[in-house]
Amino acid sequence: MTERKKAWQARLTRCACAAALALGAAAAHADQFGVQLGAGVADHDVKKLDLGLVWDPGLQWWHIAGFHFTVVGEFHAAYWKLDELAASQPNIWEFGVTPVFRFIKDSGWIRPFIEAGVGIRVLTHVELTPDRTMSTAFQFADMVGIGAQFGEHQNYQAGFRFQHISNADIKTPNPGLNFSQIYVQYNF
């Protein structure tokens, strides 16, 4: 790995740690933050571990039949492990942000929801194998999912997501990746 890439990765890691510390400190003063841990798999033997910091500004609109719409902001740092033998770079990091729109039940011990969002991502490496490249470090991440928020104080959340990551044909080739993910979240 070149010194330039190592320096770039070190800067990204420091930025992710600084963001995590800043959000962690803010969470000590508000009940609108959460920590999310997810795991997923994609085609071509790609596995993913994802750490997310979630901010809920408390916005609600369109109350319909005991449900309402809301939006949360998610900040992600993820690690990809490529198990394919021909992997050019078996370890890839992904950093990004996504606004997530939810349609969630208004009240109850268990509050089911559906969600969708489109965000941006930056990858540390774009070449997955010699014949498959993401072409650009800048990617879009769109996802849809289902889940539930639960607990006496709504501190817990679990869900399943389908996530597609690609560069939207900014540059070709653009094979994209489709992840199936499960996640758990603790809300402060």
Residue ranges of model-derived segments:
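Cleavable N-terminal export/targeting peptides
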Residues: 1-30
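Transmembrane beta-barrel strands of outer-membrane/channel proteins
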Residues: 35-41, 73-79, 114-120, 160-164
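Extracellular loop and loop/strand-boundary signature of outer-membrane beta-barrel proteins
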Residues: 37-39, 84-89, 128-134, 167-172
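Transmembrane beta-barrel outer-membrane domains
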Residues: 42-50, 88-94, 135-139, 173-177
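Outer-membrane beta-barrel "beta-signal"
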Residues: 49-53, 176-188
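Transmembrane beta-barrel domains of outer membrane proteins
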Residues: 54-58, 100-104, 147-149, 185-187
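Helix-adjacent hinge/juxtasegments
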Residues: 80-116
